Amino acid sequence: MTKTVAIANRKGGVGKTATAHALGAGLIRKGYRVLFIDLDSQCNLTDALGIESGSVEASSLDVLEGSSEASEAILQTEGGDLLPATPQLATADKLIEGVGAEYRLRDALQPIARRYDYIIIDTPPALGVLTVNALTASNKVIIPAQADLYSLTGIEQLYGTIGAVQHFTNKKLKIDGILITRYAGRSIISKDMRGNLEEVAQIIGSKVYSTPIRECIAIREAQATHTDIYSYSKKSNASKDYEAFIEEFLGG
């Protein structure tokens, strides 16, 4: 059965795209069939997989609007299959509305879902129609968060949206866990905030993954070269941390 995973947080700059890319690439390395979906108008995941967003004939927005089938819009890249983004996703809240708007991604994926073991969705740093579509289509949500006060606020806001989705559009949605990213283990603030994140995880009925993703320049360098972190720097801290996270994810 296909497992669909949304990577979400209201706050930007917490490593959503890096986590989506690393999770999908790591699963591919283990032999799983993976589809990446980019719902962020910044198109960072699309770019990381080597696709110029301005050159795509059909995007995730076209699929959500119903002007293209998912099977027609999916691109095969060296890093995996991708439903690419477009900058026009920034206007999605105005373009995608009306009865059943929350179900458009879920319904669009049904004809092709069986081709994949995992569908990984990178969401925008907002709680509008795109994130609601991602959550409605997903079995699980992973919340990347830095060990800082602003991430706590972002999680609280996201949790409200997740609760609404669980109540109205997707009762099976589960918060798989909070993944600490850009972690500075020697920082007293980071250590204290990690404790706060663990308290928040208990409140929302989830967990903090045991392995935080350490701050690592290799992540940005890999993105700049359109390469996954494992291929770019197998021995980097980020590569090791994401590998450990994936083992925990699969075991959970």
Short names for language-model regions:
Residues 1-252:
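P-loop NTP-binding core
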